[in-house]
């Protein structure tokens, strides 16, 4: 199993972008993840079918998201989040293609990797 689970956007003004998305597409916020504070961000998640749309925005200077906003000179795509049934196998395949792991988390109910 390998599927797209979530698309994340990055924005200067979280509330404005989330408000526009909710109004335009009839969405509503389902969750704010306090865990993204670890990365200097705040966020909002919305459900679309069986997937999520997330918007993140920097809350401090020097974040990856903030640097991307500056480089692009505006809001845009930030990351795609996939779900897979065999993380170890997938990671071995990605290592063969020089994909870097920039963050790893192993928790009781979920394992995750941020890749570049």
Task: Give residue spans per PLM region.
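Short, flexible helix-coil linker/hinge segments at the edges of structured domains or between repeats
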Residues: 55, 61-70
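Vicinal oxygen chelate
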Residues: 3-12, 44-49, 54, 67-116
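Intrinsically disordered, low-complexity linker/loop segments enriched in Gly/Pro
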Residues: 25, 85, 102-103
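Short acidic/glycine-enriched loop/turn segments that link adjacent beta-strands
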Residues: 37-40, 76, 109-113
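An N-terminus-focused feature that recognizes amino-terminal "leader" regions
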Residues: 1-50, 57-62
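Beta-hairpin (beta-strand-turn-beta-strand) motif
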Residues: 58, 83-85, 106
């Amino acid at each position: 199993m390998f599927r797209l689970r979530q698309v994340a956007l990055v924005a200067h003004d979280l509330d404005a972008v989330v408000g526009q998305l909710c109004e335009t597409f009839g969405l509503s916020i389902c969750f704010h993840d306090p865990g993204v504070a670890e990365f200097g961000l705040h966020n909002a998640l919305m459900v679309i079918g069986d997937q999520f749309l997330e918007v993140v925005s920097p809350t401090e200077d020097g974040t990856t998201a903030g640097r991307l906003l500056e480089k692009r000179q505006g809001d845009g795509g930030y990351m795609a989040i996939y779900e897979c049934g065999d993380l170890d196998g997938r990671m071995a395949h990605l290592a063969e293609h020089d994909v870097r792991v920039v963050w790893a988390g192993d928790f009781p109910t979920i394992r995750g990797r941020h890749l570049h």
